[in-house]
Amino acid sequence: MTRFVFITGGVVSSLGKGLASAALAALLQERGYKVRLRKLDPYLNVDPGTMSPTQHGEVFVTDDGAETDLDLGHYERFTGVPATRADNITTGRIYLDIITKERRGDYLGATIQVIPHVTNAIKEFVLDGNEAYDFVLVEIGGTVGDIEGLPFFEAIRQLGQELPRGQCAYIHLTLLPYIPSAGELKTKPTQHSVAELRSIGIQPDILLCRCDRPIPREERRKLAQFCNVRESAVIEARDVESIYDVPLSYGEEGLDREVLALFGIEAANAPKLARWRTISERVKNPEGEVSIAIVGKYTGLKDAYKSLIEALTHGGIANRVKVNLEWIEAEIFEREDPAPFLEGLNGILVPGGFGQRGAEGKIRAARYAREKKIPYFGICFGMQMAVVEAARSLAGIEAANSTEFGPTPEPVVGLLTEWMRGNELEKRAAEGDLGGTMRLGAYTAALAPDSRIARIYGDTVIQERHRHRYEVNMAYRERLEAKGMRFSGTSPDGLLPETVEVEGHPWFIGVQFHPELKSRPFEPHPLFKSFIEAAVVQSRLV
């Protein structure tokens, strides 16, 4: 029997519903249950693919090519289970599907309404394909009271009535703010949030209370009384040093035990959390530290690089070091000398991005790393700019540039118009739509057996996730390789470059894919593990 747990949020946004959902899933997994995580997003975009990273944060790409919410990254990292396009849906996607059906005549002239058509579509999404799971955890984006979230709250309310008794539960994540002048945590915002939730027909079974200090017994009793939950169901979600402490914290508070009790399951054994304790210990007690520069264009919102940050942390865990991140806006290097910003750092990473802004700054960062023998990791756009830099500085192609920025006589990077997905040829046009038209999802790459990157992977055939519209031009391969920039990995047909590396450099690698999307705390991605290892070596030379 599949059981459903719906996770909602109240009082303020950005409380960490995604992390809470992922942590609960990890706890249930450690008890031996099969868990699925899903996300309902109330915004009207069909997917986050065309949304600004500075507004929405990272776009997390799945193996099957879906552009999804960054919370799916938390789901994968905490559970180790790859997400799919079937694990995330938006209001925009639902409306698009419904309107397409209406235009086709599928509704036979019926009046299309939010209830029942939109709510039914939400319910169908939630209920579909769960036969293999013991628990399905469904996170509802946004905050209770948001207008755009009402159809989702109504849908999960209806599911509470339609599912068999004992098959559905609700967790409400809320905030207990501390007021210094009063010297106490305040429960009133949570009471009002729960009242709002109850007004639309949902009674939470568990309160997950974010706070920065212990909840006094009297405040727990007050919350239980006025929010109509058991006192044992008032769970303290206190701030922790690392997100990898969250499962440990929730486990100590008994969140998983309380969830099992809701479904009448006797929790015979405690979850096996030894590996989480190991991760926590390594994060808290590193044996050294390194400093990495991230030269990007969305540095104002760190969530734009969420998976990247975590992958670097995983590399640090693997090498038992703390990874300090120095965030540098790429445009600065277009006006100033990079040296004062990059001197003394142990590695330089240029992540993915779109557009011309900051591109020349990234090129200058790549040149500095190459000339100063500092470990360099270029991801997607970061690889492309490293190749442009090598074309200009090493191969003497002064006009080398990307057609993404406009016409150029030397298109070292150009628009990717066709490629193979398995045995099928996919095509795109320059004038086509932006949404969902990139090279998206997992693709296979073939690595040169004697290359550094093949040694790092321990294999010559790999599969990584992509999200890009432009690609390095293979017509320049011979001239670049003659100057020491090796095309060490390509698509299986040899037509598309996937990785480059600079020969004679301690560690200079560019990849067209996004390896950060597949890194896990218990399985650090080999490239990030190796990059941080190279940074550790560099730190001993400074």
From Swiss-Prot:
GO terms for cellular component: cytosol. ATP binds at residues 14-19, 71, 238-240. Residues 291-541 form the Glutamine amidotransferase type-1 domain. Pathway: Pyrimidine metabolism; CTP biosynthesis via de novo pathway; CTP from UDP: step 2/2. InterPro entries: Class_I_gatase-like (IPR029062), CTP_synthase (IPR004468), CTP_synthase_N (IPR017456), GATASE (IPR017926), GATase1_CTP_Synthase (IPR033828), P-loop_NTPase (IPR027417). It catalyses: UTP + L-glutamine + ATP + H2O = CTP + L-glutamate + ADP + phosphate + 2 H(+); L-glutamine + H2O = L-glutamate + NH4(+); UTP + NH4(+) + ATP = CTP + ADP + phosphate + 2 H(+). Keywords: ATP-binding, Glutamine amidotransferase, Ligase, Magnesium, Metal-binding, Nucleotide-binding, Pyrimidine biosynthesis. GO terms for molecular function: ATP binding; CTP synthase activity; glutaminase activity; identical protein binding; metal ion binding. UTP binds at residues 13, 186-191, 222. Mg(2+) binds at residues 71, 139. Allosterically activated by GTP, when glutamine is the substrate; GTP has no effect on the reaction when ammonia is the substrate. The allosteric effector GTP functions by stabilizing the protein conformation that binds the tetrahedral intermediate(s) formed during glutamine hydrolysis. Inhibited by the product CTP, via allosteric rather than competitive inhibition. Residues 1-265 are annotated as: Amidoligase domain. The active site is at residues 380, 514, 516. Catalyzes the ATP-dependent amination of UTP to CTP with either L-glutamine or ammonia as the source of nitrogen. Regulates intracellular CTP levels through interactions with the four ribonucleotide triphosphates. Homotetramer. This is CTP synthase. The gene is pyrG.
